[in-house]
């Protein structure tokens, strides 16, 4: 359990980290909800005692072979090509990606644009202001089987914690340790 506070700049100041041994998890999958809930309860209680606060909500991380990535490409036609791509065109593309459905047994945890292409030939980081008739993008979808996520949510609810959202531990680790230019250059984080 890590407890932090968001700074005005959007960073997170970590106030405390509490780790407890846990049984009932195999390859990232919760197999015994009682054992997992007990370990969460112990860690949360210790963090609450250290900080003098009550924890009722949490952002959770999840990892295992049931988390995967899939790419999806789509496009929109630029609303006003004479004036170039604007934020409404980018938003329209995001809306199309939000309508992409996961298989029945999975849920989409995140949708991350990998690149933008204007008129099938000009790749750009930020398409706003570019000229063209068609805006395309390849998005990386982070997918997770529903059952492991539901069990994690259930374990947190058993100790009175509402799960605000869940993210892939791999994504969370990269966000925590890599600078924006390192991510742009393709630096890899290896968590052993």
Label the predicted regions.
Residues 2-58, 62-190:
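Nucleotide/phosphate-binding catalytic cleft detector across ATP-hydrolyzing
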